[in-house]
């Protein structure tokens, strides 16, 4: 099959970009004829080995994947809405009406596609600060985002306590995000492992929040975060336990000012992770919403069937600076920024809709005016929204100055009267763990050496480790490998 320029690419200047990408594709191990990465060629049919498929496949955009015209136009509306919320926040920052801005510009296509392939309020989501379009597609509103931008008390993310674009929405199964980028990888794996443990331990199933048996966990990072230790810890655990996690890397080529080839060995995270077992790998043009939707559909289907985690490497662009505390003109040449502008998904997807006869230029212009009016109204409302009362600033905050064991401040239970030999501290901790695990099936123990014998077939013939200091001795024997 010969390589063909995808339909979403505009004419003229963008053609050179696509040609350059195709050269890079072959240099990275892709065959223009076979469209299969060289690391996957030796895999046996049906084997549980990494599968790497090509980006920029023109067939993807020719196939609408069962999406009707209303949905196809809706994709554009959400993408445009996301971009215009970014633009409104930038405007408000210039007017000193908000405190910070970090955009999701250039990432919109893959994010709307991800939401479309998943189930809002059913699956679980651990996004990062670029994921505005994902949150809009899941059901968050522009009004709610602008409440967050101004730090209003009504902000659903954190009631005005978090920075903007730090997503958290209880109704949509989006736990609150940390500013420490990369931690969401561990949080996502933890959520998936809760589902995994519940599937193994019957007593857990009515105690794990949101457990349905086939829920999928989404998490995303930028290319820079793949150099963080949390990322690799999470990926290793997910592959080892075949957890239903979709790892999405939104690769815009920069970690603030650091180019991807400087921060990532070889400049391609897909190559680095291609040897992980049980991992489905898909490399996709993240500026193409239909290609991205096809990739996510495959990933979601695999995870729902509990075949293992999935990895989506989406190549996107960053048309704006990292944030309003950054100026990309200091380190990015004009010609590079112009190349990105030529393949901006807001532009190319609108052209696709018109070229395919799905929407006319007049219809899209009317849609844009409607969105702009919606955002202007939402901004006016947000600016007038009450801020959190200053006296509430310390609510729900841990105090390092108050000793929770101080009998003068808190009532405490009288000490137990012991008889006989109490044993060592290790004995007491071990006994406590046995009692607590008996009482509460939600307690699981994991880590190096905690098992009596990780190869359970030998449990009957060996004494067992049970921790370096024997603190976890016999927990595995009593409660099973699903909990220890």
Where are these regions (language model features)?
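Acidic, glycine-rich active-site loops and adjacent beta-strand->loop/helix elements
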Residues: 129-134, 221-227, 249-255, 287-290, ...
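Long, amphipathic alpha-helical stalk/connector segments used for oligomerization, subunit docking
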Residues: 301-311
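A short, conserved beta-to-alpha structural element at the edge of catalytic cores
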Residues: 241-261
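Conserved thiamine diphosphate
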Residues: 196-199, 206-213, 265-298, 341-368
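Conserved acidic/glycine
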Residues: 1-110, 314, 319-321, 325-479
């Amino acid at each position: 099959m010969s390589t063909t320029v995808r339909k979403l690419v505009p004419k003229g200047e963008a053609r050179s970009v696509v040609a350059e990408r195709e050269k890079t594709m072959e240099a990275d191990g892709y065959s223009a004829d076979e469209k299969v990465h060289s690391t996957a060629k030796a895999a046996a049919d049906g084997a549980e080995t990494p599968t790497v498929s090509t980006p920029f496949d023109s067939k993807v955009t020719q196939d609408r994947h069962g999406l009707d015209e209303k949905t196809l136009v809706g994709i554009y509306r959400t993408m445009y809405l996301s971009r215009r919320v970014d633009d409104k926040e930038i405007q408000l920052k210039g007017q000193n009406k908000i405190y910070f801005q970090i955009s999701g510009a250039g990432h919109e296509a893959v994010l709307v596609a991800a939401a479309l392939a998943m189930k809002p309020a059913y699956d679980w989501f651990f996004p990062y600060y670029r994921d505005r379009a994902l949150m809009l597609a899941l059901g968050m509103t522009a009004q709610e985002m602008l409440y967050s931008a101004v730090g209003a008390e009504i902000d659903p993310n954190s009631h005005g306590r978090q920075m903007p674009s730090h997503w958290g929405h209880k109704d949509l199964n989006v736990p609150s995000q940390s500013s420490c980028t990369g931690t969401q990888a561990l949080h996502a794996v933890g959520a998936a492992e809760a589902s995994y443990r519940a599937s193994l331990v019957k007593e857990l199933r009515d105690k794990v929040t949101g457990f349905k048996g086939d829920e999928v966990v989404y998490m995303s990072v930028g290319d820079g975060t793949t150099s963080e230790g949390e990322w690799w810890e999470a990926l290793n655990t997910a592959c080892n336990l075949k957890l239903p996690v979709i790892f999405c890397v939104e690769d815009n080529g920069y970690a603030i000012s650091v180019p991807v080839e400087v921060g990532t060995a070889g400049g391609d995270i897909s190559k680095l992770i291609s040897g992980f077992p049980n991992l489905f790998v898909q490399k996709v043009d993240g500026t193409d919403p239909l290609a991205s939707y096809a990739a996510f559909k495959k990933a979601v289907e695999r995870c729902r069937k509990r075949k293992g985690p999935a990895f989506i490497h989406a190549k996107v662009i960053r048309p704006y600076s990292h944030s309003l505390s950054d100026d990309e003109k200091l380190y990015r040449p004009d010609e590079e920024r112009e190349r990105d502008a030529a393949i901006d998904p807001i532009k190319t997807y609108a052209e696709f809709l018109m070229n395919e006869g799905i929407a006319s230029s007049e219809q899209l212009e009317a849609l844009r005016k409607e969105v702009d009016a919606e955002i202007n109204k939402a901004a006016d409302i947000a600016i007038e929204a009450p801020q959190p009362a200053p006296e509430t600033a310390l609510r729900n905050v841990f105090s390092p100055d108050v000793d929770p064991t101080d009998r003068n401040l808190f009532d405490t239970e009288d000490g137990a009267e012991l008889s006989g030999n109490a044993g060592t501290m290790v004995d007491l901790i071990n006994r406590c763990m046995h009692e607590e695990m008996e009482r509460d099936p939600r307690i699981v123990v994991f880590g190096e050496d905690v098992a009596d014998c990780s190869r359970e077939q030998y449990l009957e013939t060996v004494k067992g480790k049970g921790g370096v200091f024997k603190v976890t001795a016999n927990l595995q024997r009593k409660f099973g490998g699903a909990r220890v």
